[in-house]
């Protein structure tokens, strides 16, 4: 049974009405609409979560006012796509799809460069802590070559990681194993920046060792 809308080319639907219509489109993928006596077809394009509204010609009213029919469909389409026609939304999606791999590749390169520059040979004698605090969160072993990483992007708490295990995570674009955030260069910390807090029993940024927030 078609969805019947009381809608004109000048009317703006409420967000609740639009969300209800989006839900119908997402569930059925293709749904027939009747708008002011004119038949239209609503399509949901799932891979970009956008909507296309197409006039369905056939009746005398459609043939006599084809332009008005198209404008009505376009207005509804723009509202469903939050200000874009489907073609505009598709072009924007393609532009973002082309840009994202390049951007992520640049970020990954920056992270790897920082990992390599901050890596160091791990020696237990260099640290005033029990060996258990030197275990890598990935391998659960003390690394031969390690690098300090923040526990989250905005955390002042750090952990020691195995260089090779961390490099593999970056290569796979895997999230941070503790915070589940995407890795960013700011998470990588040099050995000189870290200090083991004997009271709290964790590594933290040297400048903020007295006000570290546990994360």
Swiss-Prot record:
Pfam families: T3SS_NleG. Its main location: secreted. It is found in: Secreted; Host cytoplasm. A motif (PDZ-binding motif) lies at residues 213-215. Two sizes of protein are detected upon expression in C.rodentium; only the smaller protein is secreted. Changing residue 138 to K: Loss of ubiquitin ligase activity, increases interaction with host GOPC. Residues 136-189 are annotated as: RING/U-box domain. GO terms for biological process: biological process involved in symbiotic interaction. Signal peptide: none annotated. GO terms for molecular function: ubiquitin-protein transferase activity. Interacts with PDZ domain of host GOPC via NleG8's C-terminal residues. Interacts with host GOPC (human protein). Effector proteins function to alter host cell physiology and promote bacterial survival in host tissues. This protein is an E3 ubiquitin-protein ligase that probably interferes with the host's ubiquitination pathway and targets host proteins for proteasomal degradation. Can ubiquitinate ubiquitin, giving rise to polyubiquitin chains (in vitro). Does not complement an nleG8 deletion in C.rodentium. This is E3 ubiquitin-protein ligase NleG. It comes from Escherichia coli O157:H7. The gene is nleG8.
